[in-house]
Amino acid sequence: MNARKTYILKLYVAGNTPNSMRALNTLREILESEFKGVYALKVIDVLKSPQLAEEDKILATPTLSKILPPPVRRIIGDLSDREKVLIGLDLLYDELSDNEMFYSSDK
């Protein structure tokens, strides 16, 4: 992982439902293990702040948005699969390419 990058994420949830809490707990585990010290996470309860959900065109929860670094990416629904979350947010590719795990066959 490139420590110079800062990841800005927003997690939209609907109250303290089991699905919302599971999404938050899973995401925190991923962020603390993979991106410790280089991320900011804002949790937005759409029941308490519906205007924020409307501004960002959030139609379902949980929704996770990666704001920075670009491009903006979103995952809607189940966040329990670590690898799918990282791939969906385009974070796993960055992590692998920063470690030079992709090889070119253009030799």
UniProtKB/Swiss-Prot annotation:
Claim: Phosphoprotein is one of the keywords in the record: no
Keyword match Oxidoreductase: no
Gene3D superfamilies: Glutaredoxin
Annotated InterPro entries: Circ_KaiB, KaiB-like, KaiB_domain, Thioredoxin-like_sf
SMART domains xref list: KaiB
SUPFAM superfamilies the UniProt entry points to: Thioredoxin-like (SSF52833)
A Pfam family it matches: KaiB
Keyword terms of this UniProt record: Biological rhythms
Alphabetical GO biological process terms: circadian rhythm
Domain notes per entry: Has 2 forms, fold switches to a thioredoxin-like fold (KaiB(fs)) when bound to KaiC.
Other notes: The kiaA gene has been eliminated from Prochlorococcus during genome streamlining. It has been suggested that the central oscillator in Prochlorococcus does not have to be as robust as in other cyanobacteria because the former live in specific niches of the Earth's oceans; they divide exactly once a day and at the same time. Thus gene loss and changes in kaiB function compared to other cyanobacteria, can occur.
Family: Belongs to the KaiB family.
Subunit structure: May undergo a major conformational rearrangment; in the free state forms homooligomers. When bound to KaiC switches to a monomeric thioredoxin-fold (KaiB(fs)). The active oscillator complex is probably KaiC(6):KaiB(6).
Function, in words: Component of the KaiBC clock protein complex, which constitutes the main circadian regulator in cyanobacteria; it may modify the ATPase activity of KaiC.
Protein name, as recorded: Circadian clock oscillator protein KaiB
Gene designation per UniProt: kaiB
